[in-house]
Amino acid sequence: MRLKGRKIFGGKVRGTALVSRRPLSFLGGVDPNTGVIIDVESDIRGENVKDKILVFPRGKGSTVGSYIVYQLKKNGVAPKAIVVEEAETIVATGAIIAGIPMVDKIDTSKIRSGQIIEVDADKGEVNVEE
């Protein structure tokens, strides 16, 4: 199934989806040293974003979240790509400075954790393998 969205930062990757149905704050929500989701309100608490394609509706929280995304990349525990319904400034800036492919305007309800997906951010597309 091919989902068409909008490129935020380019690149092409394939990997396993890690899907949250709730907005995500990187500041206080993701451990920048390990990549583990630590937000007590998250439906994916305890999961690790490392080498996953992180899928969630939108970001929330402090502007420092952009630097947490960058720190994840510097520490080698960042997601391969970020897919969201709505890109807001915090997560978009983080993806850009970290060089993480990102696409928005995607119906994330069509993606489940564990599915193999390919993100072609240059085209603004997400291909979900069935």
Swiss-Prot record:
The keyword Lyase applies. It is an enzyme of class 4 (lyase). Signal peptide: none annotated. Coiled coil: none annotated. Its EC number is 4.2.1.182. Pathway: Isoprenoid biosynthesis; isopentenyl diphosphate biosynthesis via mevalonate pathway. The active site is at residue 62. Pfam families: AcnX_swivel_put. The keyword Lyase applies. GO terms for molecular function: hydro-lyase activity. Keywords: Isoprene biosynthesis, Lyase. GO terms for biological process: isopentenyl diphosphate biosynthetic process, mevalonate pathway. HAMAP family: PMDh_S. Belongs to the AcnX type II small subunit family. Heterodimer composed of a large subunit (PMDh-L) and a small subunit (PMDh-S). Component of a hydro-lyase that catalyzes the dehydration of mevalonate 5-phosphate (MVA5P) to form trans-anhydromevalonate 5-phosphate (tAHMP). Involved in the archaeal mevalonate (MVA) pathway, which provides fundamental precursors for isoprenoid biosynthesis, such as isopentenyl diphosphate (IPP) and dimethylallyl diphosphate (DMAPP). This is Phosphomevalonate dehydratase small subunit.
